[in-house]
Amino acid sequence: IKKITEERINMSGHSKFANIKHKKEKNDAAKGKMFTIIGKEIAVAVKEGGADPNNNSKLRDVIAKAKANNMPNDTIERGIKKAAGNASAINYETVRYEGYGPNGIAIIVDALTDNRNRTAANVRNCFTKGGGNVGTQGCVAYMFDEKGQIIIDKEECDMDPDELMMTAIDAGAEDFQDEEDSYEVITDPNEFSVVREALEAAGVAMAQAEVTMIPQNYVELTDDEAIKKMNIIIDRLDEDEDVQQVYHNWDESVSYTHLRAHETPEHL
């Protein structure tokens, strides 16, 4: 087990929790958007599996995600009740778009929409504005692995690291990594709920817990114009109401360091 922790290659070359915190800060600036995203996921989960979390693992996972994003319990409960009383009217469908950003950066966009044509046009426009383009299904998905990912903030975790690792591994986790600011647990998508619930039962607070697409390799951008264009694509996609999640293989930490190195003193 120790060998897993010590020898696992950090796929991004930097702390993933730093990336998570960066995303969370952006979401905090637009908390309404995040709550809308989670609200849709609650509605779909209730429609597919019912309103009782005890009998609906997908709903349990969404509730855990909601709590990790500081959604109030009463808001979660209202969302479940609303979805349960209006299940027949819920007509969201999951749509995935794949494409390329500047310098061939791979991008995957997951959306929940009640109008495919509207969403497709909006997503295509987001790519175009940043100099990218939407590709065909499967054009970049092979560059990612679908995994359950659980991030635990060290400041919020009192459990001994070895005990935490054993709890995760015994529950079925594939991998455990001790990062600078956090612990990262990786699972097979089918084992995600079991591992998350085992950690939850052990009293572990999770900063993030979701099934995600993890890049097999990351790509650096050091050209200022390419960095700006990539940010345009991501920001516009984040602002779209139908977009649930954006995945990419851009190593943002290197690009941020590059931009900071080229800023003049008055910009700092």
Language model features: what each stretch is:
Residues I1-N10:
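Short, Lys/Arg-enriched N-terminal segments with co-localized hydrophobic residues
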Residues M11-A106, D110-C126, G131-G135, V140, ...:
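N-terminal cationic and glycine-rich segments that engage phosphates or anionic surfaces
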Residues K81, L112-N115, G138-A141, E155-E156, ...:
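Short, ordered loop/turn segments at secondary-structure junctions
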Residues T113-R116, E156-D158, D188-S193:
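Helix N-cap motif at beta-to-alpha junctions
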Residues N133-E180:
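Extended, positively charged loop/linker patches that create polyanion-binding surfaces
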Residues P161-Y256:
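Positively charged, low-complexity, intrinsically disordered RNA-binding extensions
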Residues T257-E266:
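Conserved small/polar residues in nucleotide/adenosyl-binding loops
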